[in-house]
């Protein structure tokens, strides 16, 4: 009888357990430090020079000062007890402190991230290559743009640059958090290196691309600390509306005593201040800055560096996303799948010239051709190719190859491009070239034509696959009202097959860099906001033109400088998540604004009857909450007004839950939850507070 096999779960050893416990303990300590710092900052921000930047809370602070002074200047004509003024002033003080705490807490999280980044900025020495070839050691702070530096295994890259010689594995965990090293090599779109990262194997020569204080890490520190944070257009517009409302209510409250005197009664100053504070939108006024800062923080936690809050907001308003096929929609590892000879050519001839065209080609496709030919034991003259002059692939020509020493020109590339090249040299095109190219394209592959001078030998079948789950993600974007456009250098048949399989709305085949700009401009001319991803120098113009340009951290310096967002993980599909974060930011701001304004309805029913009931008994009909007394009603409304701010801080920091759906459906949902909820919650809250306050009055 067979004994049952017992599979044991993998157990953590003691050192691993202690390491995890240390990380948890450090995280708790950091959170505690952030909260402690935020509490101190909330007091420091009481400085009027700081408070005036938030007009709504500045008015509340002025109210606190007035009521605090009145607490020590008793009036014989006032019917309000002395303790009332001091109580109102304390409630107003806490209202301002809670608002300051929300902003300081959001800023504190950014500061914590900045501190961790500063740790990666160590003072290192760089091996600078002088013009005469001598190598001199200098401090990284003395490096300037254009300096050439050699970085060896185990050394830290001293500043941002581009690899001009060599190939090395680089540990970028200090920047990206990803422990797996990445390959950096001269030429192509993966030559960019970042200061503060470590070379873990081999040796590279780089040219410095930034001066001290201008490096990628310097920019990250500046952004996450908030030094470079400016209010976004939407934030400014909302702030203007809220400030205007505050000004209107201020005028109403200031002129109110004129009318009450005419009616034969007076309203105490503390009551007028309480009325003003309850009328103005203090909830959103206290949380507005925190929402914006937290939105940037969420993007940063997602390993995306946003150059401004405007970029994050623009992501939330995106109508069209331009996506590259290779590496974004598909895995991007197009490998040689088979060789197809044309006319009377043989597979050995196709393999021979395909290999010769690829010997000096360091792209994954070129290497896969060599591997395929060697795997099929097809012979070719490697030295012949190595002695020739390599012709790199260009987006404009859509071909690559080699010019041999005897004048022979070998090319491989897109069907249309190679056919045009052969015809320009007087060659004839075999009848089955297009037929076999179409067959490859219909299967979702990419055909590359192999030609020597004016003669076509055959085709290379490159195979790529669509990433799983892409169709579902594009369907989510469609539900959000966002159109997807796939740009690819493939021929129309291949592009159509991939587009259908992935579920994109439109595609642009045989796309050149200028075509991307044309697509972006065409969408923008329709009044739409456009997002796109890119990593190459040829993507830079389109990234700059797009409303949201997401560059890959592994890409070139030109691409990163042109974009307004950089993905530290170099994952092009992350643009979809960035759009979601942008929408979440806008929705959070809108929802809390709706909630704040809806709150005022309950406050009106609490404080207005309390002010006028004694002089106008008919106003008692408005006391639908049956509050204990006029003083209790005023204090209850003020306490709720203050307490709701810290209660909403987690929501402001985290953002409201977002589900892909149409704009109309989102509007209806949020109006129901935050509009109706904004009316109901304060009715309940004020009544509960009134019951408690009534026990002490």
Curated annotation (Swiss-Prot):
Keywords: ATP-binding, Cell membrane, Ion transport, Magnesium, Membrane, Metal-binding, Nucleotide-binding, Phosphoprotein, Potassium, Potassium transport, Translocase, Transmembrane, Transmembrane helix, Transport
Recorded GO CC terms: plasma membrane
Active site: 324
Chemical reaction(s) catalysed: K(+)(out) + ATP + H2O = K(+)(in) + ADP + phosphate + H(+)
TM ranges: 55-75, 79-99, 245-265, 271-291, 605-625, 633-653, 677-697
Binding-site positions, Mg(2+): 535, 539
Membrane topology qualifier: Multi-pass membrane protein
Localization annotation: Cell membrane
EC number from the UniProt entry: 7.2.2.6
GO MF term (any one): P-type potassium transmembrane transporter activity
Ligand binding (ATP): 361, 365, 393-400, 412
Function per UniProt: Part of the high-affinity ATP-driven potassium transport (or Kdp) system, which catalyzes the hydrolysis of ATP coupled with the electrogenic transport of potassium into the cytoplasm. This subunit is responsible for energy coupling to the transport system and for the release of the potassium ions to the cytoplasm.
HAMAP family in the record: KdpB
Subunit architecture: The system is composed of three essential subunits: KdpA, KdpB and KdpC.
Similarity remark: Belongs to the cation transport ATPase (P-type) (TC 3.A.3) family. Type IA subfamily.
Protein name stated in the entry: Potassium-transporting ATPase ATP-binding subunit
């Amino acid at each position: 009888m067979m004994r049952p096999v017992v599979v044991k779960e993998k157990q953590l050893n003691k050192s691993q357990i202690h390491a995890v416990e240390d990380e948890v303990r450090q995280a708790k300590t950091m959170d505690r430090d952030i909260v402690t710092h935020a509490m101190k900052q909330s007091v420091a921000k009481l400085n009027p020079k700081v408070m005036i930047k938030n007009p709504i809370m500045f008015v509340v602070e002025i109210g606190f000062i007035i009521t605090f002074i009145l607490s020590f200047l008793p009036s014989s004509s006032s019917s309000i007890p002395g303790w009332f003024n001091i109580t109102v002033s304390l409630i107003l003080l806490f209202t301002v402190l809670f608002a300051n705490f929300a902003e300081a807490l959001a800023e504190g999280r950014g500061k914590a991230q900045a501190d961790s980044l500063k740790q990666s900025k160590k003072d290192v020495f760089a091996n600078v290559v002088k013009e005469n070839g001598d190598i001199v050691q200098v401090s990284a702070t003395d490096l300037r743009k254009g300096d050439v530096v050699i970085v060896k295994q185990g050394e830290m890259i001293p500043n941002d640059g581009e690899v001009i010689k060599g190939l090395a594995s680089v540990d970028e965990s200090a920047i990206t958090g990803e422990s797996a090293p990445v390959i950096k090599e001269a030429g192509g779109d993966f030559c960019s290196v970042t200061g503060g990262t470590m070379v873990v194997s081999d040796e590279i020569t780089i040219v410095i691309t930034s001066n001290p204080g201008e490096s990628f890490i310097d920019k990250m520190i500046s952004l996450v600390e908030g030094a470079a944070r400016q209010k976004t257009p939407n934030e400014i517009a909302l702030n203007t509306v809220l400030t205007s409302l505050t000004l209107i209510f201020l005028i109403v409250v200031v002129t109110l005593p004129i009318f009450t005197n005419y009616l034969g009664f007076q309203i105490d100053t503390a009551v007028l201040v309480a009325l003003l504070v309850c009328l103005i939108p203090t909830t959103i006024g206290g949380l507005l800055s925190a929402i914006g800062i937290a939105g940037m923080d969420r993007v940063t936690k997602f390993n995306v560096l946003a150059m401004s809050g405007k970029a994050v907001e623009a992501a939330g308003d995106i109508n069209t996303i331009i996506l590259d096929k290779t590496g974004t929609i598909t895995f991007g590892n197009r490998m040689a799948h088979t060789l197809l000879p044309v006319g009377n050519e043989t597979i050995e001839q196709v393999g021979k010239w395909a290999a010769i065209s690829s010997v000096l080609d360091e792209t994954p496709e070129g290497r896969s051709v060599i591997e395929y030919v060697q795997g099929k034991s097809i012979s070719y003259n490697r030295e012949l190719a190595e002695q020739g002059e390599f012709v790199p692939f260009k987006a404009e020509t859509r071909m690559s190859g080699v010019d041999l020493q005897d004048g022979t020109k070998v090319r491989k590339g897109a069907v249309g491009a190679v056919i045009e090249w052969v015809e320009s040299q007087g060659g004839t095109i075999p009848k089955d070239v297009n037929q076999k190219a179409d067959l490859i394209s219909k299967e979702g592959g990419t055909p590359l034509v192999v030609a020597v001078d004016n003669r076509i030998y055959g085709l290379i079948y490159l195979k790529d696959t669509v990433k799983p789950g892409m169709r579902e993600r594009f369907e989510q974007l469609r539900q959000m009202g966002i159109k997807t456009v796939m740009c690819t250098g493939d021929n129309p048949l291949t592009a159509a097959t991939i587009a259908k399989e992935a579920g994109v709305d439109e595609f642009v085949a045989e796309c050149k860099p200028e075509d991307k700009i044309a697509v972006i401009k065409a969408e923008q001319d329709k009044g739409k906001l456009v997002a796109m991803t890119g990593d190459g120098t040829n993507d830079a113009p389109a990234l700059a033109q797009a409303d949201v340009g997401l560059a890959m951290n592994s890409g070139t310096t030109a691409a990163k400088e042109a974009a307004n967002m950089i993905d530290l993980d170099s994952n092009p599909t992350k643009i979809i998540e960035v759009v979601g974060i942008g929408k979440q930011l806008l929705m959070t701001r809108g929802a809390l604004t709706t909630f704040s304004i809806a709150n005022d309805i309950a406050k009106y029913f609490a404080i207005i009857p309390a002010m006028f009931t004694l002089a106008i008994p008919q106003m008692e009909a408005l006391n639908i909450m049956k509050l204990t007394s006029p003083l209790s009603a005023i204090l209850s409304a003020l306490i709720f007004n203050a307490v709701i701010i810290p209660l909403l801080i987690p929501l402001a920091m985290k953002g409201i839950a977002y589900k892909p759906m149409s704009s109309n459906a989102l509007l209806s949902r949020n109006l129901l939850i935050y509009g109706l909820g904004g009316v109901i919650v304060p009715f309940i809250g004020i009544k509960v507070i009134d019951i408690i306050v009534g026990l002490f009055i």
